[in-house]
Structures are given as C-alpha cells and as structure tokens.
C-alpha cells in the first residue's frame, strides 16, 4: 500500500525578502495570512514558517526588511485557519528553553484545535546567534541539547508532572496545562541529516524527518543511515514519515 504524498506551503514571513516592501507591517502580515487561508482552501495539508530572527544572509539591506517571529505569527495563522496543519521548519532549539517550548506547543495545539506539528532542529545560523546574544555551541553539543529538549517536551506533554535532569537542561515537577489536544502528543518533526548524531535523534524521537537539501542519491543514502539507527533501538523505520 502506497501513502499519499502530502503537500505543505512555506508562508512568506520575510526570510528571503518575500513580503511586499511598499506596505505597512500590518498589511504585510495580512498578505501572508491571506496566502495561508488560500493554501487551506486549495487543500494543502500544512503551512510552515521558518524560525529565524534575522533575514537570510542573501537579503540585501536586511535592516530594511520586515521579518516576523515564527511562533507569534503561527498563532495568528492558527486563528485564521480551521483545518490545515501548522508547523515550524524548524524551531531552533537554542532560542527557547525546552520547558517553555513545551508550554508554547501545548498552547498552540489548543488554539489550533489540534493541528500543531512541532518542527525542531539544532539551529545553524551563527550570525543570528551572535546578533541576538545566544551561545553558538559546537555541533555535537547542539545535537545533545536537542536530544534532552525532546525528552523534556515529550514528558511535559504526556505526564501530569514531569521531572528530568540532564547535562544541559533540567525540570522538576513541571506541569503543562493545557495538555496538547493531539494524543499522545503533537507530531514531532526533526530537521537535519548528520549521520552519527542527528539521525540518531531522529530515530529516537521523530514522527517526521525533514531532509531539506541534497540530491535523490544523497537522500537515499541518508535514509539507509537512518534505518540503521532505527534498527539499533528497535524502531520501525517506516513509522517515521519522510519530508523534503
């Protein structure tokens, strides 16, 4: 049995200077909102926003470009739509504590009536980290932080009180109400394709894996590596939805 291909649309928010420049920020948001509702009317399965704080480095005169924050804008799009799934491609794990992110995700799942997909990754845009005062840890540390974050988020979404102590993060008797509408929790999409660490996190935590760059041949290779990680922990490789 073959699965139906699902289609998602990245909604303009300013990342590549993709909002009209001759109108107010409010009108720019309304432009993006209208595209989101249009996508829903055309039966797109999902809409997505990028989680960055600065426009792409390819944008000229970035100080002149409107660029909306991901989670705030996605909450507004959740209210403007009724059935389309909503997600981040992908949330930067470094920008919010995992306990706060769990609370934000549960709230957005309630606002949207159970339509959240939590897209998350390690983060990579180093100049953005520097501009906003975030520590840019080595890749291996960022991946391990992501692993701990997903442990915390999953616990807070599924347990009345959650406790966890790792190397980088800890919570004690953390309560997350409202709990997510989706059970056992909203789908978790993990972006990234590092073979030793990131794909191991995908195998452990992800309901969906996003492979964002590369040729079909590279995708095939990465999937073979992901399958190996799944086999190591007894995870069904086919239980992870693949996205590009």
Language-model features and meaning:
Residues 1-80, 184-186:
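N-terminal beta1-alpha1-beta2 module of alpha/beta enzyme domains
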Residues 2-5, 61, 88, 94-205, ...:
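Internal, glycine-rich beta/alpha segment that forms the wall or movable "lid"
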Residues 9-13, 51, 88-90, 120-122, ...:
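A cross-domain feature marking catalytic cores of carbohydrate-active enzymes
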Residues 22-23, 90-92:
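The substrate-binding groove and active-site-proximal loops of carbohydrate-active enzymes
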Residues 28, 32, 70, 74, ...:
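Aromatic/hydrophobic pocket-lining residues that form the small-molecule binding cavity
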Residues 45, 82, 207-209:
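Receiver (REC) domain switch/active-site residues of two-component response regulators
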Residues 55-56, 64-66, 93-99, 213-221:
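Acidic-and-aromatic substrate-binding clefts and catalytic sites of carbohydrate-active enzymes
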Residues 81-89:
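Conserved catalytic cysteine-centered active-site region
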